[in-house]
């Protein structure tokens, strides 16, 4: 009996030793695992530097971003022939769109055009929704406070377009006192009416075709517009519109057109200026302008 008790004691002791051994082994495994995990979470300075060097750097400037994405996005308002409009296949056309393509080609990227309300283009440029604004923008000190301008690519006079038969009726500032004179919303023409015709009532709409219809229907005395656009409106009106004999002075209304670019992008401005200086010097912009006038006329725009 004593032998049996002795055997039981030895057996129980072995069980305790085995349990202690297994517990120690498990604890060691857990500690080892934790140690490995901590080591993986905290790379050395050399490893950290190597990882940072391997990560591609984000494009810093707008010019670099354009080249990285492989396209330049241009905002315009495509109802302003001959500068920007759409052809019969709904493709963007006009001398401004031709200029946009020259800029894209110079950058070695594709051109993407976004059609939007004219008064939304500058905010879109500022926010980065589009890269450039090309929509016959007049270079003014007020706008230059918000965005940067390229060099001028065209200078044009301003016309007063009236209903056929009213060319002499509305030929002086006095003849327009108290009458509505139209312009596209957000344009320099709106400012011109307020400054040069302070006793007339400014009438604004989003689109020039709608303004032309208001003139034809006799709802407004006339509309103020760039010379090329005004001549195109008259040519496509089937005799319903004509150019008034009213004239603005050169100080009032000799406006130059520029490309709109967000502030702080001098390198992109330089590229755009290089293109503008080339196409204005070699006559290719004038050729594109003449072709745009012909195309717009053939489309009745």
Predicted regions and their residues:
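Acidic, polar ligand-binding/catalytic clefts
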Residues: 101, 105, 110-175, 248-250
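Bacterial lipoprotein signal-peptidase II cleavage site
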Residues: 31-44
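Extracytoplasmic small-molecule ligand-binding "clamshell" domains
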Residues: 45, 57-136
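A ligand-binding cleft/hinge motif common to bilobed small-molecule-binding domains
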Residues: 120, 137-145, 192-195, 216-217, ...
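Periplasmic-binding protein-like
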Residues: 155-162, 235-274, 296-301
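Extended ligand-binding regions for polar small-molecule ligands
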Residues: 46-52, 97-106, 180, 185-187, ...
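Ligand-binding clefts/hinges and TM-proximal coupling segments of bilobed small-molecule sensing domains
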Residues: 39, 55-58, 188-205, 242-248, ...
